[in-house]
Swiss-Prot record:
The lineage of its organism: Bacteria, Bacillati, Cyanobacteriota, Cyanophyceae, Synechococcales. The keyword DNA damage applies. Residues 18-66 are annotated as: Disordered. It comes from the Bacteria. This protein is involved in the repair of mismatches in DNA. It is possible that it carries out the mismatch recognition step. This protein has a weak ATPase activity. This is DNA mismatch repair protein MutS.
């Protein structure tokens, strides 16, 4: 049996100790087959726990194989008699009882195993073999399934992707050869969907959020005050905020696509699940969220005396959520489990978010405008983010995604971002130089985070070093920027010399192209450490000795192709072709026979082998020690590295927006601030284009359109046939607004854009099967949300209201909603509709204007112009659209007759009068 390898502060076996071969003496292979049979008859060996199998094969018995079957009590760790289990399984059950809501992977030799119901579960989930293990003579067989330790990352990634948490129990000591004594094992890692830091488990261009929620007592029916705190453990970002109403809470949760949500009680879990059953929650100790424990946790984590400096003094709900989150992270932190205080989850100081700081885009609007994914297929390609992301680094891509999630309301910050884009557009050399720097830049945010947690590989540290070496070049670029630019650029203007010294130190100590795993050696440069150099000299000497020994044995045996080779199980051996066996000298000891090869050892080789292993093990240990010293130095600079990395990410995002602007002819919009005076509110876009559709069109030019909002034109009634471009146009307005408020240039010829506080959309609707709501009820719920939350500074985009009920009911609702938006809320609104009767609103309201999508009809053919012009349409061309869609001619002809009859007998248009 091989000696077990130890994983030191590393889940995926990148820091093994070198394995040593079993040096036990071998029995000479000099007994014939007949002699062996006689020997077995003299001393028969008894098979254990298989009496029924013996009976079956010796006596042709059909008796049941009871001991080979898994009985019902042995299926679950909860029902098995723990005291009757083997020591290893008893330990497994103890750990499983402490982690009942997580999958426990238990290291046995070269495998991580699951037992009982976990084994059945992962065998189905991962499609791996389900087998069994003897749990003791009174228990019998129990289910077992496992994965090889070297493939752990791949399988863990699959489990995490399916929203399961994993507990890793590893071996904490190496085998001593006394196989009667179980090795010491313990939990070395708890991995949850929201706390992974391994590259293979993360989406490079997305944040991986873990969110804690605290709900206070409801202040009125269904109106809870809440606090949420979310962190990306891999990048160190930490955000917290407060709010009211469950709907706003879910907007925040769903918008960020959080990977894991923790709450303090089952009551809160039940309340939230009643609102949305598609989100999974983890319930942790309720005390984590108490104000006293939360405050103490926050102070201890950030090593501060007061919360005032964090801005949390009067934010009790946010404080409780933050305390609950930090407490949870400390509980599952691997450094606590390994008693190593040098390793920890490193988070930045919390950034408090207030609604007044950002444009609010609820989940429904994100979905309707296809901001990050398409509405129908949920694909990235075809989204707004897809259309503008030209970033070179993963850091920049995540930064751009965060900006789109939370566009700015601060006009100064918007203008400063625009200024950097202008700098890039005005200088091709500036663009090219920055591209060359960023093109090979590593993900400094996550790389430094892995170093802080003790999981960075040698290649990770080299990537950090290479990234830090580029800082002086970035500094020179930032100094060339004209105009007023954001304050975060100071991180690049004032580079910490210690970071550059750290980069040089990494390059001095680590080789440029290190192996993937530390167990392979060859990480540290020669000349770095005298002890390591001395050990390497000895290794070279032993290598020379082996070469000389090979030449000597060739000469003695006269076998020219003889080789001395190494096998991890057998150690060093002499290998010869089987045809040369007759030339083997007498001092060779036969080790192994293969099909075409014979293997031997000599006393000299075996004696020297132990010394070789001793030196190699010492060298490997010294090399790992030196590597850890470098990694700890990087860990100490994690916060500083991340500060610089965030500035680099912003530069990358803005460079990408500049490239997008150049490629797609975007222009710099003029931005005006929010104002409470409707007379001063104005948005004017000339030649606006839909940034998504324009890039998807490959064989024709996109038709641009204008839009104007002012005190005389707050509500636009947009009419026109189906498939004429109404939905594309209203989405276009929302997308241009978002681009303007993230500081981007926009697809237009000219744009003067007023900042808005929220964007609301109601575009299309389907039945909500999870809540049992019909299409019409979903539509009305969305409409109610808009009417109750919109302000005069909001942008409202409506595509049909009042469908799914009778014509007169629908028209009445659409009319009333339109008038409420124009008279009561007085916000910028586009209402696309087939109710042509709404064109009459212009005559009774001074801030309503009618627009239509132009079409041309020649004989029986309909041509869509996709051009928006003043005036209301008087025909929907629904029958013509149906004809284009391929509806049978017979149905079309009948529809024409019915329409003619209805138009002649419907006096609604003539009779409609609104007081």
């Amino acid at each position: 049996m091989e000696e077990d390898t130890i994983i030191q502060k590393d889940l995926f076996a990148i820091n093994h100790e070198l394995k040593r071969p079993n040096n036990s003496s071998q029995i000479p292979d000099d007994l014939s087959t007949e002699e062996l049979k006689k020997e077995s008859q003299k001393r028969p060996r008894q098979r254990k726990n298989s009496t029924n199998l013996i009976n079956k094969f010796k006596n042709n018995s059909n008796s049941e194989r009871k001991n080979d079957c898994i009985n019902e009590k042995s299926y679950s760790y909860k029902t098995v008699e723990k005291q009757k289990l083997t020591p290893i399984l008893k330990h497994y059950v103890t750990l499983k009882e402490e982690n009942s809501n997580r999958l426990l992977l238990y290291r046995l030799g070269d495998f991580f195993e699951c037992f009982f119901e976990d084994a059945v579960f992962i065998s189905n989930l991962l499609e791996i073999t389900l087998t069994s293990k003897d749990a003791g003579k009174d228990i019998g067989k129990i289910p077992m399934a496992g994965v090889p330790y070297h493939a752990m990352e791949r399988y863990c990634a699959e489990l995490i992707k399916k929203n399961h948490s994993v507990v890793i129990c590893d071996q904490l000591e190496k085998s001593t050869g006394n196989y009667g004594t179980p090795l010491k094992r313990g939990i070395t890692r708890i991995i949850t969907p929201g706390t992974v830091i391994e590259e293979g488990m993360l989406v490079a261009k997305k944040n991986n959020w873990i969110t804690a929620i605290h709900l206070s007592e409801n202040i009125s029916e269904n109106l809870y005050e809440w606090g949420i705190s979310r962190a990306d453990v891999s990048t160190g970002e930490l955000l917290t905020m407060e709010g009211q109403s469950i709907s706003k809470l879910f907007d925040e949760i769903i918008k960020l696509d959080t990977s894991e949500i923790i709450i303090g009680s089952n009551e809160e879990k039940k309340l939230l699940e009643n609102q949305n059953q598609q989100i999974t929650y983890t319930v942790t100790q309720e005390t984590f969220f108490s104000i006293n424990e939360a405050c103490l946790t926050i102070k201890n984590y950030f090593q501060i005396l007061s919360l005032e400096g964090l801005g949390l003094k009067h934010l009790n709900n946010a404080t409780k959520a933050l305390g609950g989150l930090l407490n949870y992270l400390e509980k599952i932190n691997p450094s606590n489990l390994e008693n190593d205080s040098s390793l920890k989850i490193s988070l930045d100081f919390p950034q408090i978010q207030f609604p007044k700081d950002h444009l609010i885009i609820d989940y429904q609007t994100q979905k309707n405008l296809e901001i990050k994914n398409t509405q129908r297929e949920n694909n990235y390609a075809g989204s707004l983010l897809w259309s503008i992301d030209r970033t070179y680094t993963c850091m920049g891509a995540r930064c751009l995604r965060r900006w789109i999630d939370s566009p700015l309301l601060n006009i100064d910050e918007i203008n400063k971002r625009q200024n950097i884009i202008s700098n890039f557009l005005e200088s091709k050399k500036l663009r090219t130089d920055t591209q060359n720097i960023l093109r090979a830049m590593g993900d400094l945010e996550r790389l430094s985070g892995r170093a802080c947690a003790g999981h960075a590989s040698p290649r990770d540290l080299i990537a950090i070093s290479e990234g830090l070496k580029k800082l002086p070049r970035l500094k020179s670029i930032v100094k060339l920027f004209k105009y007023e630019i954001p304050s975060w650029t100071n991180q690049l203007k004032n580079i910490d010399n210690e970071l550059l010294e750290l980069a040089d130190l990494i390059s001095f100590k680590l080789v440029q192209n290190p192996p993937l795993n530390t167990s392979e050696g060859g990480i540290i440069h020669d000349g770095v450490d005298n002890v390591l150099d001395g050990l390497r000299n000895l290794i070279d000497d032993y290598s020379d000795w082996l070469n000389q020994e090979e030449l000597k044995e060739r000469k003695i045996s006269k076998i020219s192709n003889l080789k001395i080779q190494f096998h991890k199980n057998f150690g060093y051996y002499i290998s010869i072709n089987k045809s040369k066996v007759n030339l083997a000298p007498a001092h060779w000891i036969k080790r192994q026979t293969l099909t075409n090869e014979e293997r031997y050892v000599t006393t000299e080789i075996k004696n020297r082998e132990s010394k070789i292993f001793q030196v190699k093990n010492r060298a490997a240990a010294k090399e790992y020690e030196l590597f850890c010293e470098v990694r700890n130095l990087v860990s100490a600079k994690t916060k500083r590295i991340r500060s610089v990395a965030k500035a680099i990410a912003c530069i990358d995002a803005l460079l990408g927006l500049a490239i997008t602007s150049l490629e797609n002819n975007f222009i710099k919009p003029t931005i005006s601030p929010i104002t409470n005076s409707t007379d001063q509110q104005s948005t004017k876009i000339i030649g606006g284009r839909n940034p998504i559709v324009e890039q998807l069109l490959t064989n024709r030019k996109f038709i641009s359109n204008d839009i104007l909002f002012n005190n005389k034109q707050k509500l636009i009634i947009l009419t026109g046939p189906n498939a004429s471009g109404k939905s594309c146009f209203i989405r276009q307005i929302g997308l241009i607004q978002i681009l303007a408020q993230i500081g981007s240039f926009v697809p237009a010829s000219k744009a003067d854009i007023q900042i808005v506080d929220r964007i609301f959309t109601r575009i299309g609707a389907v039945d909500d099967q999870s809540t049992g709501q019909s299409t019409f009820m979903v539509e009305m719920s969305e409409t109610a949300s808009i009417l109750n939350q919109a302000t005069s500074n909001s942008l409202v985009l409506l595509d049909e209201i009042g469908r799914g009920t009778s014509t007169f009911d629908g028209l009445s609702i659409a009319w009333s909603v339109s008038e409420y938006l124009a008279k009561k809320i007085v916000c910028n609104t586009i209402f696309a509709t087939h109710y042509h009767e709404l064109n009459y609103l212009k005559h009774t309201n001074t801030n309503v204007e009618n627009f239509q999508v132009l079409v041309k009809q020649k004989k029986d053919q309909l041509f869509f112009c996709h051009k928006i012009e003043k005036g209301g349409a008087n025909k929907s061309y629904g029958i013509e659209a149906a004809k284009l869609a391929g509806v049978p001619k017979e149905v079309i002809n009948k529809a024409i007759l019915v329409l003619d009859y209805l138009e002649k007998n419907n006096q609604l248009n003539a009779q409609i009068k609104i007081k």
